Amino acid sequence: MNNQKYIRNFSIIAHIDHGKSTLADRLIEYCGGLQAREMSQQVLDSMDIEKERGITIKAQTVRLVYKAKDGNTYYLNLMDTPGHVDFAYEVSRSLAACEGSLLVVDSTQGVEAQTLANVYQAIENDHEIVPVLNKIDLPASEPDQVKQQIEDIIGIDASEAVLISAKSGIGIDLVLEAIVNKLPPPKESSTDILKALLVDSWYDPYLGVVILVRVIDGSLRKNMKVKMMATNSVYTIENVGYFTPKKHISDVLHAGEIGFFTASIKQVADCKVGDTITDEKKPCKQALPGFKPNLPVVFCGLYPTDSSEFEHLKDSLAKLRLNDASFEYEMESSSALGVGFRCGFLGLLHLEIIQERLSREFDLDLITTAPSVVYKIHMREGEVLEIHNPADLPDLQKIDSMEEPWIKATIMVPDEFLGAVLSLCTEKRGIQLDHNYIANRAKVVYKLPLNEIVYDFYDRLKSCSKGYASFEWQMDTYEPSELVKLGILVNSEVVDALSTIVHRSRAEQRGRALCVRLKDLIPRQQIDIAIQASIGSRIIARETIKALRKDVLSKCYGGDITRKRKLLEKQKAGKKRMRQYGNIEIPQSAFIAALKIGDE
């Protein structure tokens, strides 16, 4: 198959739950990619978490063969991309592998914030976009209003939008005809020298790393030696093929085609998404544009609740890293929690998914420390440090200034909840950049500190809008900020696991909230326990757990007063010794609850 005019490479853009994976299932079914008995819901979402949460995490591809009404047979390469903001870079690379997109919008809900972000990326990649309105068989469907929304918000013509119901299969043939007639074929190859885009990769226990590629120029053949331009690694191709969505082995992938190859590569970390693959003997002169390394944005500590599970956790993280190169970890120890790992994630959803996979696939019970972000610390000597662990923060006297990351957030919300959303953004130190109305929905754009987002922003946004607000963000800039390290002391001992870096204006509120929470969680002892929040050497909040009174005189029935006095003196001396050397045991449940504090 080398006639490029019969190839269509396209992706499906949609907000979570707007029916993207269901539409992909119907297209596969219609084109006979799988037998009816092999079909399952969300065929392309392979992980259980993907199916349960209704999200796509890894990019998947499928080649469909479609005989169109014009009598020609077309080869359609569907690229199923992640829709969540944490995986925005993967989305941009998947879109770069295609020439067109289907924009799927739920006709009962309208355009959402995440749809916007991905549509703008598709427009940047010069995609031809075909609007598709899903769920038209539902009573609440408003296709005309949603068409108007698409034109007003995104600015593309929606008058000929395809009306479908992916669940019941209405209009699937119209979608396939629109793909053939409205989306362009790949550009003609200008050279025979191999140039291919690495779209995604995952680990297969039998084949090693499987690499998903889009061939731009030349062709990719079995036994060919190829070079990765970002890492300069050279590999010999062992298998070449494509998915239907079953794996099919072929001898060659031509320009314009999307498929996979294997080359006994051991680690996914060696295969960077967005890299350019070329022939080792005749390399192309220039790499494809847009490659950038995927850097973690959110960090937190993961500790096993039982220290004997440490080796199991270490092995489990290594296995997850095989399949997820954007996830990073290094060992760290805490006096309160023992030995664990400091892990880096692309965002909060990524963190949640890794946590869930560790507990589900590896049966681990973990404590997660408060999430933090990367701060830039300008030292007085001129050195610039990047830190994400509060324990690494240098002495305040040596610091000249600190910078924290800010993000640009787009929020779409029904106008009746707008007031609550605006006050939440203001409370989180947000700066409003834009605000406009489309029909009965408002679109607001805010600049917000990432530090404030990683705690509980998303949960609070959903609760103050009854679940109707949608939220999308991208990194913006680093800006100078008055940051301080908030320490927690129990009985004058610093508890390192509860230390956080916060903005000075929020320090007292968060410190007080933590002290109050810990007061309820730490069991009473025979002495008073002071729980304090501090900035440097200054105490900003304090709570005291009152002592239990142990009645040492209960066994003295009558008798001489000196006997009673002797027992009381002995107890007094014991308490003094306890205050001096006493070690307060903080139960694990207290840590877990205290770390969930958010901004209460």
Swiss-Prot record:
SUPFAM superfamilies, sorted: EF-G C-terminal domain-like (SSF54980), P-loop containing nucleoside triphosphate hydrolases (SSF52540)
Reaction(s) catalysed (UniProt annotation): GTP + H2O = GDP + phosphate + H(+)
Record CDD domains: EF4_II (cd03699), EF4_III (cd16260), LepA (cd01890), lepA_C (cd03709)
Chief place where the protein resides: membrane
SMART domains, per the entry: EFG_C
GO BP term (any one): positive regulation of translation
Cellular component GO terms, alphabetical: plasma membrane
Its EC number(s): 3.6.5.n1
Coiled-coil intervals: none
Subcellular location: Cell inner membrane
Residues that, per the record, bind GTP: D17, H18, G19, K20, S21, T22, N134, K135, I136, D137
InterPro entries reported in the protein's UniProt record: EF-4 (IPR006297), EFG_III/V (IPR035647), EFG_V-like (IPR000640), EFTu-like_2 (IPR004161), G_TR_CS (IPR031157), LepA_C_sf (IPR038363), LepA_CTD (IPR013842), LepA_IV (IPR035654)
Domain named tr-type G: residues: 5-187
Keywords: Cell inner membrane, Cell membrane, GTP-binding, Hydrolase, Membrane, Nucleotide-binding, Protein biosynthesis
PROSITE patterns named among the record's database cross-references: G_TR_1 (PS00301), G_TR_2 (PS51722)
HAMAP family associated with the record: LepA
Function: Required for accurate and efficient protein synthesis under certain stress conditions. May act as a fidelity factor of the translation reaction, by catalyzing a one-codon backward translocation of tRNAs on improperly translocated ribosomes. Back-translocation proceeds from a post-translocation (POST) complex to a pre-translocation (PRE) complex, thus giving elongation factor G a second chance to translocate the tRNAs correctly. Binds to ribosomes in a GTP-dependent manner.
Family: Belongs to the TRAFAC class translation factor GTPase superfamily. Classic translation factor GTPase family. LepA subfamily.
Protein name per its UniProtKB record: Elongation factor 4
Source organism per UniProt: Rickettsia bellii (strain OSU 85-389)
Name of the gene: lepA
